[in-house]
């Protein structure tokens, strides 16, 4: 089949070259128009349900809202995890779906089940699903800063809510624009209970008057003088005077009682659950642009920047928009870095080919296969919908060296056959027809084996394709693009390369020995191979023993899910104890921001504590998220690295009650979405009794702090909140004609504040709140004395119908699959993640006694690593079996297929030692490198075995298979190995040359790519030894055993 393809391609070379030209043009177009991003979209398919229950404590929100929702959503088809978050006034339910679920199908199913549960929710409470985006979609953040001092925080927030937000939402593929920080203007009506009693007016009557005084009505239309006039009755409240003039009742003497007679009306801030601060200089308002799932981040960010630039002219005097986070900077750095690495690889590979072949036109044949293979890869990426990012370009980058292997072997074989023709026809000039025939025959000779070897390299990545979840989404693009590149190289090797050789390999072909580099290689290899063939069993024994040398480096190499990716920005997410007030949270935020900004490498600090106004952010008030933009590296102090900056920040920001955590923004949001844990290592304690969960979590926190390498650990306090419990006495309430519901309505309105509508001021809408003044609700004793006017117009106090006590309780409740849980955040440095987790597990088993009904599970990146390892342990053996079948189909002998397969562990020795020398940990990235190395090593073995078989078949004594001498066998093996050392040395050289720029790279994404390249580079030390020495020695023993009766 392969022979037929090669011969038909040569016969129709004009059509083939036209097709190659078309591919190059089409591929160039796709390269230019392929969407770009920093990382693949790693987010799970999720649907967020947000339910507001204003003024309600977390326990009430959990019991009445979150619990019904989570238990119902567990039945949604395809849902794998349901997480619930109950906090003050809000419920968030995250429904995480299985891989491959269509997002919009998932949203429709969640809506279907949401309709079913709506009747179980409290009256007046309705749920809504969040935008078709995730927390990973936070691609652009900005702050509104007043440089003039003329605009307060409420004006800045109004500017964001009613102007910028709407303008930015018009940009295609912006899912949502979330407001953060500032203060929301609110009309506050502080009712004096004493005056209410004097006038005999109850609080519900005031609410009713407010609601009826803030309406508009239509009166249809009237016809006047042949014209139609539409009738409207305007009644919206638009000023404080409008509020003051609301009539509550009319006295017996006809004198009206106005709202101003019983209440004070003012504007003030709505209760704050999110605060923003910039550079330690004070609070600001801001916004977050959230990308729709699966869309082009850089295009959207460009459109956002352009829109903001046009809106600057419309801003009030002195107001400035300051960019505080821009993901396109990372995208550009990552793409530029890998693009330059690809160009470096192309250049280095070209030099290697020219040096070995000593023939420029022949080198061009090999080199031209690289851009053509790149075009093929991008064309397939275009149809698959893959964007260009660190991982997809990285797949092409690690394939560059192997892509030219087939071309190198074919060119070298053509050189060899043309050289042989010259020896057989001394003094003759080869004609064009004969030259095409020789080149075609040379291609046919090695084509099938090369195609099989490239197919093995391609299939070796099957385990990567089977990865699921976050690791599958991360390494899937790399596996796809590497496969496309290798598949393109395989197709080019049997279709285009023979034709290019026919066109360009002309004139006098330099003999192999005329190249000084080749002479050195042959001279060095010749005596070593003779000794190996003289002592084949000793050679194999030494090789087998060398495999055991990896035991020690393996024991020293730690484990991790992925290396930390330097995104160019940082996210500061300290863990704080619960129960902090908004004022204290704002002060703490400004203090930490000011300390962070004092580090010279920091460009800007945008701090946020609490949540932004979006369903994608469920952060409680005590949760700090500070975005740190770093200056370009050329502006850093000499010798500074990202790790040194983090260490300095950690030393600088040392405040009581804070457990510091410094993480990359995208990486952190991905982890929080996938596992819910914001730190690299997380521990989830689940149970049924909150006090037991809390006690267990705090015990684990104490023992985890003693583990070497742990720099911070903090367990969430489920019982850390402070509650004022109002326990209504039903009997006492009934004596005053009040029900429990009446008292609860009074508590929620007078103390918590009741929302009684909103004002309409152009496009702006501002809430109206009614409650008692602060003096009546600033202590438990004041609450007891709070006046109540009963339905029978009796004056009593709250203490007459209820007992008031101060107790502790949860500030936030978390559940996973409807089971309450407490999360413990662990940050470790100086040790690998797997070792730290194993030590924590040991400490927990020895020192922590679990309460009945509680369970402990490790999460975070460790959970992802375990999931990936479990899948690889299943798929790697299956892939090895597939490779064995391919080898058998190639050689039609079990012993020869086993020879290549059994020798692969030796090729991995160099990779393991090199990994240890570089100080890298075992991870999914290094595992990917080892899988790629195994495929390349198998290719080396196939090519060497092919040369040895050809040499034996061409030997006059061995080809008869009657009798032969061991010397004759050694001579044939010598010709197959030594006289073909050039192509083997070239393949090693081009692979190493292609990988070194990746290993030495320092730009965005280099952390992952260097881990993939390291095992392959180390393996290029032992894999050639496998091909050059072990395969010939083992093949000699196999041949002798197979023909032992013919030995003379």
Swiss-Prot record:
Q: Which GO terms describe its cellular component?
A: plasma membrane
Q: What is its main location?
A: membrane
Entry membrane topology: Multi-pass membrane protein
Q: Name one Pfam family in it.
A: ACR_tran
- Protein source organism: Salmonella typhimurium
Q: Where does the record place it?
A: Cell inner membrane
- State the superkingdom: Bacteria
Which segments cross the bilayer? 14-34, 125-145, 338-358, 363-383, 391-411, 446-466, 485-505, 539-559, 737-757, 871-891, 897-917, 928-948, 985-1005, 1012-1032
Give the record's keywords alphabetically: Antiport, Cell inner membrane, Cell membrane, Membrane, Plasmid, Transmembrane, Transmembrane helix, Transport
User: What family, per the record?
Assistant: Belongs to the resistance-nodulation-cell division (RND) (TC 2.A.6) family.
* Taxonomic lineage from the root: Bacteria, Pseudomonadati, Pseudomonadota, Gammaproteobacteria, Enterobacterales
InterPro entries assigned: AcrB_DN_DC_subdom, Acrflvin-R, CusA-like
Q: Name one GO molecular function term.
A: monoatomic cation transmembrane transporter activity
Protein's UniProt keywords contain Membrane: yes
Q: What is this protein called?
A: Putative cation efflux system protein SilA
- Function noted in UniProt: Component of the sil cation-efflux system that confers resistance to silver. May be part of a three-component cation/proton antiporter.
């Amino acid at each position: 089949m392969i022979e037929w393809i090669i011969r038909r391609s040569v016969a129709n070379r004009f059509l083939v070259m036209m097709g190659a030209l078309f591919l190059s043009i089409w591929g160039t177009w796709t390269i230019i128009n392929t969407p770009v991003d920093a990382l693949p979209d790693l987010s799970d398919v999720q649907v967020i349900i947000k339910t507001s229950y204003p003024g309600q404590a977390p326990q009430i929100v959990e019991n009445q809202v979150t619990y019904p929702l989570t238990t119902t959503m567990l039945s949604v088809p395809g849902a794998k995890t349901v997480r619930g978050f109950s906090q003050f006034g809000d419920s968030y339910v995250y429904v995480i779906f299985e891989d491959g679920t269509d997002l919009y199908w998932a949203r429709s199913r969640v809506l279907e089940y949401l309709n079913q549960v709506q009747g179980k929710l409290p009256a007046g409470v309705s749920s809504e699903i969040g935008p078709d985006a995730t927390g990973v979609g936070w691609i652009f953040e900005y702050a509104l800063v007043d440089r003039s001092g003329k605009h307060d925080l409420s004006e800045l927030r109004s500017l964001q809510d009613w102007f910028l937000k709407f303008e930015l939402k018009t940009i295609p593929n912006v899912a949502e624009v979330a407001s953060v920080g500032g203060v929301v203007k609110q009309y506050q009506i502080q009712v004096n209970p004493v005056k209410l009693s004097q006038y005999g007016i109850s609080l519900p009557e005031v609410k009713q008057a407010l609601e009826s005084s803030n309406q508009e009505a239509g009166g249809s239309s009237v016809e006047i003088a042949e014209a139609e006039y539409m009738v409207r009755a305007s009644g919206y409240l638009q000023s404080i005077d409008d509020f003051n003039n609301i009539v509550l009742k009319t006295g017996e003497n006809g004198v009206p009682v106005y709202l101003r007679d019983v209440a004070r009306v003012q504007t003030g801030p709505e209760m704050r659950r999110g605060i923003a601060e910039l550079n330690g200089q004070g609070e600001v308002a801001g916004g977050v642009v959230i990308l729709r799932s699966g869309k082009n981040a850089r295009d959207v960010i460009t459109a956002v920047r352009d829109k903001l630039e046009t809106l600057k002219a419309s801003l009030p005097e002195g107001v400035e928009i300051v960019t505080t986070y821009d993901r396109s900077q990372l995208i550009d750095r990552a793409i530029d870095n890998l693009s330059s690495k690809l160009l470096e690889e192309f250049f280095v590979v070209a030099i290697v080919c020219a040096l070995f072949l000593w023939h420029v036109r022949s080198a061009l044949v090999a080199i031209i296969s690289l851009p053509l293979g790149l075009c093929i890869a991008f064309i397939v990426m275009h149809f698959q919908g893959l964007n260009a990012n660190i991982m997809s370009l990285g797949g092409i980058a690690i394939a560059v060296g192997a892509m030219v292997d087939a071309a190198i072997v074919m060119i070298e074989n053509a050189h060899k056959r043309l050289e042989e023709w010259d020896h057989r026809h001394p003094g003759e000039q080869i004609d064009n027809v004969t030259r095409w025939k020789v080149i075609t025959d040379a291609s046919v000779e090695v084509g099938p084996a090369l195609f099989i070897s490239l197919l093995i390299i391609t299939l070796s990545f099957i385990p990567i394709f089977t990865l699921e979840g976050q690791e599958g989404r991360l390494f899937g693009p790399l596996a796809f693009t590497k496969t496309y590149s290798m598949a393109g190289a395989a197709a080019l090797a049997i279709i285009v390369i023979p034709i290019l050789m026919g066109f360009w390999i002309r004139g006098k072909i330099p003999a192999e020995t005329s190249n000084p580099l080749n002479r050195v290689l042959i001279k060095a290899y010749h005596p070593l191979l003779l000794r190996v063939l003289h002592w084949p069993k000793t050679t194999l024994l030494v090789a087998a023993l060398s495999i055991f040398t990896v035991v020690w480096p393996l024991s020293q190499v730690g484990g991790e899910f992925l290396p930390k990716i330097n995104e160019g920005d940082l996210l500061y997410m300290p863990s704080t104890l619960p129960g902090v007030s908004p004022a204290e949270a704002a002060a703490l935020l400004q203090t930490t921001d000011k300390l962070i900004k004092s580090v010279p490498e920091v460009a800007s600090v945008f701090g946020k504590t609490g949540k932004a106004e979006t369903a994608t952010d469920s952060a409680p008030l005590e949760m700090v998220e500070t975005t740190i933009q770093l200056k370009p590296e050329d502006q850093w102090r000499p010798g500074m690295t990202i790790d040194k900056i983090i260490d300095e920040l950690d030393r600088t920001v040392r405040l009581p009650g804070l457990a510091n955590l410094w993480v990359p923004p995208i990486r952190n949001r991905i982890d929080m979405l996938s596992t819910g844990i914001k730190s690299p290592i997380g521990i989830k304690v689940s149970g049924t009794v909150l006090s037991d969960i809390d006690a267990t979590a705090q015990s684990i926190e104490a023992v985890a702090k003693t583990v070497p390498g742990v720099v911070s650990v903090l367990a969430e306090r489920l019982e850390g909140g402070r509650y004022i419990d109002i326990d209504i006495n039903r009997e006492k309430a009934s004596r005053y004609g009040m029900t429990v519901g009446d008292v609860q309505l009074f508590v929620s309105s007078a103390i918590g504040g009741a929302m009684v509508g909103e004002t309409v001021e152009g496009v702006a809408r501002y809430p109206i709140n009614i409650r008692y003044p602060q003096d009546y609700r600033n202590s438990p004793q004041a609450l007891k004395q709070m006046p109540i006017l009963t339905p029978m117009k009796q004056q009593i106090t709250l203490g007459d119908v209820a007992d008031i006590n101060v107790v502790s309780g949860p500030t936030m409740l978390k559940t996973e699959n409807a089971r309450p849980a407490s999360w413990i955040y662990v940050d470790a440095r100086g040790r690998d993640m797997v070792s730290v987790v194993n030590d924590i597990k040991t400490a927990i088993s020895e020192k922590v006694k679990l309460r009945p009904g509680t369970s402990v599970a490790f999460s975070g990146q460790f959970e992802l690593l375990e999931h990936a390892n479990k899948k690889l342990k299943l798929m790697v053996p299956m892939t090895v079996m597939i490779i064995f079948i391919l080898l058998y189909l190639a050689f039609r002998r079990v012993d020869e297929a086993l020879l290549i397969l059994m020798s692969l562990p030796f090729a991995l020795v160099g990779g393991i030692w090199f990994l240890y020398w570089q100080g890298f940990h075992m991870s999914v990235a290094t595992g990917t490198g080892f899988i790629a190395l195994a495929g390349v090593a198998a290719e080396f073995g196939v090519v060497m075995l092919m040369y040895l078989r050809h040499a034996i078949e061409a030997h006059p004594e061995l080809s008869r298979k009657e009798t032969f001498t061991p010397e004759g066998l050694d001579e044939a093996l010598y010709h197959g190995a030594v006289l073909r050392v050039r192509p083997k040395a070239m393949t090693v050289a081009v692979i190493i040359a292609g990988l070194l720029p990746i290993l030495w790279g320092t730009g965005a994404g280099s952390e992952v790519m260097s881990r993939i390249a390291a095992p392959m580079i180390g393996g290029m030390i032992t894999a050639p030894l496998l091909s050059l020495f072990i395969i010939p020695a083992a093949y000699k023993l196999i041949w002798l055993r197979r023909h032992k009766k013919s030995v003379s």
